[in-house]
C-alpha cells in the first residue's frame, strides 16, 4: 500500500499546481522565468527565517519543552512575516521591471500585466512552499508504513496532502490579492493577506484536530479565491462564459495590460 499512498498523496498535493503550470505558464518562457524567480524569493525568505529561529534557539539555550513550543510558534510567525515582506519586495522588483520595459518601447505593450505576474509569482511561492513542507512527509509514505509517531492519525498522509494543496492554492490567491492591494495602495488588503496567512500557519498550534484545521483552511481558501477572482477582473458573467467555453479572452490568457 505504500506506493499507492505515495502517488495518491503526491497527486493530491501537487496535481492542481502542476496542471496550472502546464496549461498557463509552461508555454511562455517569460512566465517560467518569473515563476522561478518567485520560488527563489520564497527560498530566501525561508533561509532568513530559519537563521533567525536558529539564533534565537542558540541564544536562549533552554531545553524546557514549553519554551521550545513557544520558540516553534515564534518561528512560524516570523516565517510568515518574512514571506510577506519578500512578496512585497518581489512586487517592487516586478513593478520596476515592468516600468523599465514600458520606457524602452512606450508605443508597444511588451510588459506582462501585473495581474498575470501576481498569479505567476503566487504559484511560484506556493509550489516551493508545498515542496518544502510535504516532501519529507511524502518520502516517509514509501515505508515502512508508519510516520514514526506513536498514536498518530492513520489519515496523517492524506491530511498533510490536502493541507499542502490548500497552502499552494492560497499562495496563488494571496499573490493576486496582495499585488492588487499594492497597485491600488489598499494597505488593509496587505494586512488581510498577512492575517489569513498567520491563521492558516498557526492553527495547528491551536487545535490538534486535523479535520478542524482542514475545514478552516479550506474556508479561508474559498473566500480568498473569490476575492482574487474579482480583483483579477472576473465576474459572474465571465465565469459563466468560461465554464461554457465561450470566452476567448478570459483572465490570465489576456495579455493586455490592465
From Swiss-Prot:
Record GO cellular component, one term: membrane
Major subcellular site: membrane
Keyword Chloroplast: no
Location in or out of the cell: Membrane
Functional description taken from the UniProt entry: Potential subunit of the gamma-secretase complex, an endoprotease complex that catalyzes the intramembrane cleavage of integral proteins such as Notch receptors and APP (amyloid-beta precursor protein).
Transmembrane segments: 5-25, 32-52, 71-91, 116-136, 161-181, 187-207, 214-234
Pfam family, one: Aph-1
Description of how the protein assembles with itself and partners: Potential component of the gamma-secretase complex.
GO biological process: membrane protein ectodomain proteolysis; metanephros development; Notch signaling pathway; prepulse inhibition; protein processing; short-term memory; synaptic transmission, dopaminergic; synaptic transmission, glutamatergic
Alphabetical UniProt keywords: Membrane, Notch signaling pathway, Transmembrane, Transmembrane helix
Stated family: Belongs to the APH-1 family.
InterPro entries to which the protein is assigned, alphabetical: Aph-1
Protein name, per record: Putative gamma-secretase subunit APH-1C
Membrane topology: Multi-pass membrane protein
Amino acid at each position: 500500500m505504500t506506493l499507492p499512498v505515495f502517488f495518491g498523496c503526491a497527486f493530491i498535493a501537487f496535481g492542481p499546481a502542476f496542471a496550472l503550470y502546464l496549461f498557463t505558464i509552461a508555454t511562455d518562457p517569460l512566465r517560467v522565468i518569473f515563476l522561478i524567480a518567485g520560488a527563489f524569493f520564497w527560498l530566501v525568505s525561508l533561509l532568513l527565517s530559519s537563521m533567525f529561529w536558529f539564533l534565537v534557539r542558540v541564544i536562549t539555550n533552554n531545553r524546557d519543552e514549553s519554551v521550545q513550543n513557544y520558540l516553534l510558534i515564534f518561528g512560524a510567525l516570523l516565517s510568515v512575516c518574512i514571506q510577506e515582506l519578500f512578496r512585497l519586495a518581489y512586487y517592487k522588483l516586478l513593478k520596476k521591471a515592468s516600468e523599465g520595459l514600458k520606457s524602452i518601447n512606450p508605443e508597444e505593450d511588451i510588459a506582462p500585466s501585473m495581474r498575470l505576474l501576481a498569479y505567476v509569482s503566487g504559484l511560484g511561492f506556493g509550489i516551493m512552499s508545498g515542496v518544502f513542507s510535504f516532501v519529507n512527509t511524502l518520502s516517509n509514505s514509501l515505508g515502512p508504513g508508519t510516520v514514526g509517531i506513536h498514536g498518530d492519525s492513520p489519515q496523517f498522509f492524506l491530511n498533510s496532502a490536502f493541507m499542502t494543496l490548500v497552502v499552494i492554492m492560497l499562495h496563488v490567491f494571496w499573490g493576486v490579492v496582495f499585488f492588487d492591494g499594492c497597485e491600488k495602495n489598499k494597505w488593509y488588503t496587505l494586512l488581510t493577506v498577512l492575517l489569513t496567512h498567520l491563521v492558516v500557519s498557526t492553527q495547528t498550534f491551536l487545535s490538534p484536530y486535523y479535520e478542524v484545521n482542514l475545514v478552516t483552511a479550506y474556508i479561508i481558501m474559498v473566500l480568498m479565491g473569490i476575492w482574487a477572482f474579482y480583483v483579477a477582473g472576473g465576474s459572474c458573467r465571465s465565469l459563466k462564459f468560461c465554464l461554457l467555453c465561450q470566452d476567448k479572452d478570459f483572465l490570465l490568457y489576456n495579455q493586455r495590460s490592465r
